[in-house]
């Protein structure tokens, strides 16, 4: 009996030692990884360690050691975050600038925002949806909404507004049928609005009993409910309804100013008849505005406070969704670098696409937000590149044609091993050779003359281009010497001979004149001028004179072949 007890104690000690060793193994693994999974705990612990109480003790022990226990799904998510963090760190290192560089700071700050699970995305979307419903409900209480809706409906009927910009198309099955119903809907709204105005004016009657007031208020509430139902039949997009809200806020400011004016006049009205008259006028003005709004001042203030609160909640939820998906923008934007826009510009354009995706996301369809947002972000980035990347803007459809031609050229080059001719490329794509040449010409990127060459920044591209309009110093010196020598030689001729040569060859202003034009200056015939010119040229060919000018023949030949013009030699 004693031996059995000793054997049992020895077995318990061995088992306890094994458990201790396994726990140490768990802690070591957790410290190496920074966490441990439930699957790893089950693998490491011995099979005998299977009761819930024992497992709980192990989990309590690990918690006391600050060891994080995760599910396998959490581990995969954590690995994905680490991978993204490394990518962001690499981008931050590659982005130029000092530690306070905006790109670096943006990437660093963005990396601290955790990603959302599908459940969290749905929860945020529900918050946005709830806020939008409440915003719409409050805005449609005001008579301003009726006037705005009727105005927009008239624009739709007359074709002055795009249907998809105003109406939520998912709510409308038949566009033609909807447009045919609009006139009837407008008529019903106007009737309800007139009825509402009549009841509001009737409430002002001081002779009304409490019972009549209660009856009128009840009728008013029913009228408002019917009006809101008709307004919802317009199926306006949420951003259009929010535009109605801008009218409400603008009117609210004028209400507050009028209320302040009334409060100031109340103090002075007791001892000043003029102030009392102004107070009465201000109160009448306030009443007219209350009728125009369809709400009393107190109701107006209460509704606006609620409207602002729900708008803040909507913005907060949208901001949370956007900030949690900024990494998605980075992952897409980095694929479009070196296409004419800076990385920061690509991020900004992608963020605008992300915000549009948040506005239009429908969580009930079942897909993840990132799947839906990818298309909006990509569209925003590619559209920005098409619109802004080039100095001379190329339409989006032409960008697609250029890409098609470039892809076709690349394919033919891989098949044939040489650059395809316009004829070969046109045959492959169904274009004429001239069309292919035109597309290639459009695809060329203009280069700024101020573009820096090299890393030093000391020289620009324009410094390496020849300016044919500027005279070289050697030519300028040569022509200056020729001009001086020509003056000396011409002085050896008579005044008439010198005048004829200067004007016949354009030595004065660079424009040669005809015999008739020179003859009119001397009032002689063309033949007489020709004789004077021939005599003067014979004198110029004399060795004494021609010897002085022969050295400049090369300069004159170069000038004739270069520009085809003769320079003037005027002082």
From Swiss-Prot:
This protein's encoding gene: sigA
Domain of life: Bacteria
Sorted UniProt keywords: Cytoplasm, DNA-binding, Sigma factor, Transcription, Transcription regulation
Major subcellular location class: cytoplasm
InterPro entries for this protein: RNA_pol_sigma-70_dom, RNA_pol_sigma70, RNA_pol_sigma70_r1_2, RNA_pol_sigma70_r2, RNA_pol_sigma70_r3, RNA_pol_sigma70_r4, RNA_pol_sigma_70_r1_1, RNA_pol_sigma_70_r1_1_sf
Compartment(s) of residence: Cytoplasm
Region annotation Sigma-70 factor domain-3: where it falls in the sequence: 400-476
GO cellular component term of the entry, any: cytoplasm
Annotated region described as Sigma-70 factor domain-4, given as residue ranges: 489-542
Subunit architecture: Interacts transiently with the RNA polymerase catalytic core.
SUPFAM superfamilies with a match to the protein in the record: Sigma2 domain of RNA polymerase sigma factors, Sigma3 and sigma4 domains of RNA polymerase sigma factors
GO MF, any single term: sigma factor activity
Protein name per the record: RNA polymerase sigma factor SigA
Keyword ATP-binding appears in the UniProt entry: no
Positions of region (Sigma-70 factor domain-2): 321-391
Family named by the database record: Belongs to the sigma-70 factor family. RpoD/SigA subfamily.
GO BP annotations listed: DNA-templated transcription initiation
PANTHER family, A to Z: RNA POLYMERASE SIGMA FACTOR RPO, RNA POLYMERASE SIGMA FACTOR RPOD
Protein species of origin: Chlamydia muridarum (strain MoPn / Nigg)
Keyword Cytoplasm: yes
NCBIfam families to which the protein is assigned, alphabetical: PRK05901.1-4, RpoD_Cterm, sigma70-ECF
Short sequence motif Interaction with polymerase core subunit RpoC: positions: 345-348
DNA-binding region: 515-534
Function, as annotated: Sigma factors are initiation factors that promote the attachment of RNA polymerase to specific initiation sites and are then released. This sigma factor is the primary sigma factor during exponential growth.
């Amino acid at each position: 009996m004693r031996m059995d007890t000793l054997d049992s104690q020895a077995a318990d000690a061995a088992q306890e030692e094994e458990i201790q060793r396994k726990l140490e193994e768990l802690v070591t693994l957790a410290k190496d990884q920074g966490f441990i999974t439930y699957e790893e705990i089950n693998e490491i612990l011995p099979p005998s360690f299977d009761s819930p109480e024992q497992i709980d003790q192990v989990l309590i022990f690990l918690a006391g050691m600050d060891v994080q226990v995760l599910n396998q799904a959490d581990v995969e998510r954590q690995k994905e975050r680490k991978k993204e963090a490394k990518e962001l760190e690499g981008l931050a290192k590659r982005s130029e600038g000092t530690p306070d560089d905006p790109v670096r700071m943006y990437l660093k700050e963005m990396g601290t925002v955790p990603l959302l699970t599908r459940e969290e995305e749905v929860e945020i979307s529900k918050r946005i949806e709830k806020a939008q419903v409440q915003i719409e409900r409050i805005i449609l209480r005001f008579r301003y909404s009726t006037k705005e809706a009727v105005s927009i409906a008239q624009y739709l009927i007359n074709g002055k507004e795009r249907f998809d910009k105003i109406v939520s198309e998912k709510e409308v099955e038949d566009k033609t049928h909807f447009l045919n119903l609009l006139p009837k809907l407008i008529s019903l709204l106007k009737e309800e609005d007139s009825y509402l105005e009549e009841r509001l004016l009737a409430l002002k009657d001081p002779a009304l009993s409490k019972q009549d007031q209660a009856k009128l208020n009840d009728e008013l509430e029913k009228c408002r409910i019917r009006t809101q139902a008709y307004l919802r039949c317009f199926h306006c997009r949420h951003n259009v309804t929010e535009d109605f809200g801008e009218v409400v806020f603008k009117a609210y400011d004028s209400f507050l100013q009028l209320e302040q004016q009334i409060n100031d006049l109340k103090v002075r009205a007791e001892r000043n008849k003029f102030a009392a008259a102004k107070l009465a006028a201000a109160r009448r003005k306030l009443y007219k505005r209350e009728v125009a709004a369809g709400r009393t001042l107190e109701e107006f203030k209460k509704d606006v406070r609620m409207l602002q609160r729900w708008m803040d909640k909507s913005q907060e939820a949208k901001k949370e969704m956007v900030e949690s998906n900024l990494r998605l923008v980075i992952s897409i934007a980095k694929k479009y670098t070196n296409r004419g826009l800076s990385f920061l510009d690509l991020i900004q354009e992608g963020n605008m696409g992300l915000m549009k995706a948040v506005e239009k996301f429908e969580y009930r369809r079942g897909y993840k937000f990132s799947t839906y947002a990818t298309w909006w972000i990509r569209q925003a980035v590619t559209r920005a590149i098409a619109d802004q990347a080039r100095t001379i803007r190329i339409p989006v459809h032409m960008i697609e044609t250029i890409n098609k031609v470039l892809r076709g050229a690349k394919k033919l080059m891989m098949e044939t091993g040489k650059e395809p001719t316009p004829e070969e490329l046109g045959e492959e794509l169904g274009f004429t050779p001239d069309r292919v040449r035109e597309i290639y010409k459009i695809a060329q990127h203009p280069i700024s003359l101020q573009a820096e060459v090299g890393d030093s920044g000391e020289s620009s591209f324009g410094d390496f281009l020849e300016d044919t309009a500027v005279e070289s110093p050697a030519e300028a010196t040569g022509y200056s010497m020729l001009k001086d020598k020509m003056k000396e030689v011409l002085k050896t001729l008579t005044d008439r001979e010198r005048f004829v040569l200067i004007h016949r060859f354009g030595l004065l202003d660079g424009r040669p004149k005809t015999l008739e034009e020179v003859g009119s200056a001397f009032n002689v015939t063309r033949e007489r001028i020709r004789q004077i010119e021939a005599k003067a040229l014979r004198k110029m060919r004399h060795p004494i004179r021609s010897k002085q000018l022969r050295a400049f023949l090369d300069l004159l030949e170069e000038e004739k072949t270069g520009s085809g013009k003769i320079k003037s030699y005027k002082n």
